[in-house]
Amino acid sequence: MGFIFSKSMNENMKNQQEFMVMHARLQLERQLIMQNEMRERQMAMQIAWSREFLKYFGTFFGIATISLAAGAIKRKKPAFLIPIVPLSFIFTYQYDLGYGTLLQRMKSEAEDILETEKTKLELPKGLITFESLEKARREQSKFFSDK
């Protein structure tokens, strides 16, 4: 009778362990999905920030360009136009980020790097797996239980 009881307990324990592993995998998948959602939202916020910044910077750039051009014409000193050059680079970059194709170009460049320069992207100890995470978790729990 004890053998039947222990066999049943072993099966229940095995089923519970399988359930826990499955649950841990689901939790990890959910965490990865959540991290991707957070990344997408951060990118959307960056684009929105760039568009909002462009409105204010565009106004400043327009007023500065008109003022500097008027000063250069009035004082007959073309050196007044020099600050327009770096301001135009900033304006162009922000416009390209907010409304242009900068993100698509960055994405295609990143995809190209992923395809052709794979060795530069390798992690120091290789890819993180569920098993390696479990091993580290077990070692950490042993460390805390020893103290």
Swiss-Prot record:
Gene Ontology, cellular component aspect: plasma membrane
Cytoplasmic membrane side: 74-78
Locations listed in the record: Cell membrane
Extracellular side: 1-52, 100-147
Keyword DNA damage (UniProt): no
UniProt keyword terms in alphabetical order: Cell membrane, Chemotaxis, Inflammatory response, Membrane, Plasminogen activation, Transmembrane, Transmembrane helix
Coiled coil: none
Name this protein carries in UniProt: Plasminogen receptor (KT)
InterPro entries: Plg-R(KT)
Membrane-related topology note: Multi-pass membrane protein
Biological role stated in the UniProt entry: Receptor for plasminogen. Regulates urokinase plasminogen activator-dependent and stimulates tissue-type plasminogen activator-dependent cell surface plasminogen activation. Proposed to be part of a local catecholaminergic cell plasminogen activation system that regulates neuroendocrine prohormone processing. Involved in regulation of inflammatory response; regulates monocyte chemotactic migration and matrix metalloproteinase activation, such as of MMP2 and MMP9.
Predominant location: membrane
One Pfam family here: DUF2368
Quaternary data: Interacts with PLAT. Interacts with PLAUR.
Cell membrane in keyword set: yes
GO biological process: chemotaxis; inflammatory response; positive regulation of plasminogen activation
